[in-house]
Amino acid sequence: MASHAGQQHAPAFGQAARASGPTDGRAASRPSHRQGASEARGDPELPTLLRVYIDGPHGVGKTTTSAQLMEALGPRDNIVYVPEPMTYWQVLGASETLTNIYNTQHRLDRGEISAGEAAVVMTSAQITMSTPYAATDAVLAPHIGGEAVGPQAPPPALTLVFDRHPIASLLCYPAARYLMGSMTPQAVLAFVALMPPTAPGTNLVLGVLPEAEHADRLARRQRPGERLDLAMLSAIRRVYDLLANTVRYLQRGGRWREDWGRLTGVAAATPRPDPEDGAGSLPRIEDTLFALFRVPELLAPNGDLYHIFAWVLDVLADRLLPMHLFVLDYDQSPVGCRDALLRLTAGMIPTRVTTAGSIAEIRDLARTFAREVGGV
């Protein structure tokens, strides 16, 4: 069922929302995960942490919305923005990773290199893309306790607003590159197997935007090394739609092993996630990420999925099930998007931290990340 906890959990966000005035009312979905799946554990006297992951296809408006949010809130110690690690991607981890990715796809599309050659480059580049997220998640994880829900939960002592969750580079973009022919399904599942366990209080904000407007926004923005690739745009939009459907499928009782036989291997159009879908019907497995992996490369001679790949799909289900999913309507002004995000935070779930010093350590971690790898 939809989770309605959290009205008292984000006072700074709430105050900014009230100060920003009325909007046109286009907000986003309520969280799709059941309330209380992870009740507060540990010392109830310890402070709470709210983590918000703004994710979705590139060019939809995530960074602009986050910038509007931070500007509205103003400088404060209890809210920290964690940007994309562009300096790591372009300098520290490798040289011009984004340029390498787009050029490799372009060369593959023109027939200048083979799919195998492209896959080698893409897989290596995607490791670079995922490293900052995976490392940061690992350092943060020991500080995250159980979910703090109910009237006794205090307001967050610290809120982190992340530009993307680790699943972007460990699941969504590898899957999109697979759809583009520049990564193998085996490589995609290798990344999935490395997805870290989902910590309590993972509030994931995806988004919807008409494709024509999305393409127009992407064409107008300037990012280092980026090409306007409409085929890739369609692929990544499809993957994020599948992601939203998969979370809802799992949280509404879907079991991929039981439904696997319904897959035929023929891809169909994927329904867009509905921002107002709080506790709707069970999505079909055909409309989830599981459908991408019923392909000959992963099947044994008898037609069954090899056990090793099935175990990876179990990992995928395990990682997605606990997420608190929100869907933001980006088809409005930056201020409208900001206000919609502010309203969404009322339903987000914080967690207790694990030590008295955790809040200070987490704040320092986030600021170090932003300072060291968050530049352009």
UniProtKB/Swiss-Prot annotation:
Q: Which reactions appear under catalytic activity for this entry?
A: thymidine + ATP = dTMP + ADP + H(+)
EC number(s) given by UniProt: 2.7.1.21
The residues listed in the UniProt record as binding substrate, with positions renumbered to this chain, are Y102, Q126, R223
Q: Which residues bind ATP?
A: G56, P57, H58, G59, V60, G61, K62, T63, R217
Entry keywords, A to Z: ATP-binding, DNA synthesis, Early protein, Kinase, Nucleotide-binding, Transferase
Disordered as annotated region, ranges: 1-47
Which principal EC class is assigned to this enzyme? transferase
* Uses: Used in molecular biology as a selectable marker to identify transfected eukaryotic cells. Used in cancer suicide gene therapy to selectively kill transformed cells.
Molecular-function GO term, any one:
ATP binding
Which GO terms of type biological process are on file? DNA biosynthetic process; TMP biosynthetic process
Active site per the UniProt annotation? E84
Further remarks about this protein from its record: Phosphorylates and thereby activates certain drugs like acyclovir (ACV), valacyclovir, and famciclovir to a toxic form, that leads to successful suppression of the infection, while the uninfected cell does not have this ability because it lacks TK. Mutations in thymidine kinase may induce HSV resistance to antiviral therapies in immunocompromised patients. The most frequently observed resistant strains are unable to express TK and are avirulent in animal models of disease.
Oligomeric and partner information: Homodimer.
Q: Describe the family membership recorded for this protein in Swiss-Prot or TrEMBL.
A: Belongs to the herpesviridae thymidine kinase family.
Role, per record: Catalyzes the transfer of the gamma-phospho group of ATP to thymidine to generate dTMP in the salvage pathway of pyrimidine synthesis. The dTMP serves as a substrate for DNA polymerase during viral DNA replication. Allows the virus to be reactivated and to grow in non-proliferative cells lacking a high concentration of phosphorylated nucleic acid precursors.
- Name of protein: Thymidine kinase
Q: Which species is listed as the source?
A: Human herpesvirus 2 (strain 333) (HHV-2)
The coding gene here is TK
